[in-house]
């Protein structure tokens, strides 16, 4: 899919032509769409389609006619009826006339620009647009990390009494997400630092310098949060694995003790079911023998139960 946007000081609209000062947004573009843009702006098609590889690393490539910036952005995906965070590459290409973004699927990081929910955003201010995207991306990482933290607290409350593996598996999924986030954030940080350096060929104004510095701070804060949450999740995973095992052991112990208590009346009643001679059966001839035997069996079971409770085995 190809979208072309143009903004002025008074309006923001989608157009059909490739004009100077536009923003071209490519979402999983076809080969023909890629060739059209590559030929129009003298871009190597391999660079244009590089962000469509989900394994592409964050980097900056500087060519004579354009600069390619690739960063990892967070998105959500559904697996096993649950929502998880993953990262995919976003490519940003800046030329003399336009800015091009390319990715595998629609991204939340670009929605605020498409829906015009961000102030001081203009497609013709290409450098600032790049820094605004990077800043918004850092904010999304912080939001995603906060969401992961809340989710881990919910799982923690369920795990205290759990004997199942589902919650533990979900906790491990969150831990894996944090690991991917940390890797993506650190490569994004290197890209941002390179943009802030004097060797960057992207023109920056004073306001842009401040925005880029804020972006670096937000990214570093996200890295610190990911480190903290990652350590907490790792500890939680190990701790609750032991808790689940302990809960299962307690259930097995309870079942074993119930079996012992129930075996007392079973042994008594089984004795009366054996082939004794009439004069050998205890309480033979007693008119209330049945109820007396039941009472004795019940009393012995209760006594055994109280003894086990006293010993804190129950």
Describe each region flagged by the PLM.
Residues 1-197, 203-204, 214, 218-225, ...:
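Peripheral, non-transmembrane regulatory/ligand-interaction domains of membrane transport proteins
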Residues 37, 121-122, 196-213, 231-249:
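Hydrophobic alpha-helical transmembrane segments
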Residues 42, 220-314:
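Hydrophobic alpha-helical transmembrane segments and their immediately adjacent juxtamembrane loops
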């Amino acid at each position: 899919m190809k979208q072309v946007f143009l903004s002025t000081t008074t309006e923001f609209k989608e157009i059909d032509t490739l004009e100077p000062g536009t923003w071209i947004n490519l979402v999983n573009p076809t080969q023909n769409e890629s060739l059209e843009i590559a030929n129009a702006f003298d871009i190597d098609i391999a660079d244009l389609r590089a962000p469509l590889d989900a394994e592409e690393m964050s980097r900056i490539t500087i060519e004579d006619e354009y600069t390619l910036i690739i960063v990892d952005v967070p998105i959500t995906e559904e697996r096993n009826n649950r929502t998880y965070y993953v990262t995919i590459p976003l490519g940003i290409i800046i030329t003399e006339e336009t800015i091009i973004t390319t990715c595998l699927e629609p991204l939340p990081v670009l929605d605020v620009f498409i829906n015009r929910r961000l102030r001081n955003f203009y497609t013709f201010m290409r450098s600032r647009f790049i820094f605004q995207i990077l800043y918004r991306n850092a904010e999304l990482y912080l939001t995603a990390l906060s969401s992961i933290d809340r989710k881990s607290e919910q799982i923690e409350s369920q795990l205290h009494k759990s004997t199942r593996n589902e919650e533990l598996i979900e906790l491990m999924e969150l831990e894996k997400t944090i690991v991917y986030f940390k890797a993506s954030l650190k490569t994004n940080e290197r890209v941002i630092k390179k943009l802030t350096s004097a060797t960057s060929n992207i023109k920056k104004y004073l306001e842009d310098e401040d925005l880029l510095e804020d972006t670096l701070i937000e990214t570093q804060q996200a890295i610190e949060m990911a480190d903290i949450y990652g350590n907490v999740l790792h500890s939680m995973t190990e701790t609750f694995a032991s808790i689940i095992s302990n809960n299962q052991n307690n259930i097995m112990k309870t079942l074993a003790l119930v079996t012992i208590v129930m075996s007392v009346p079973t042994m008594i009643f089984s004795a009366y079911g054996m082939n004794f001679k009439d004069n050998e059966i205890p309480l033979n001839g007693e008119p209330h023998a049945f109820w007396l035997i039941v009472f004795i069996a019940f009393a012995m079971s209760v006594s055994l139960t109280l003894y086990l409770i006293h010993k804190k085995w129950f």
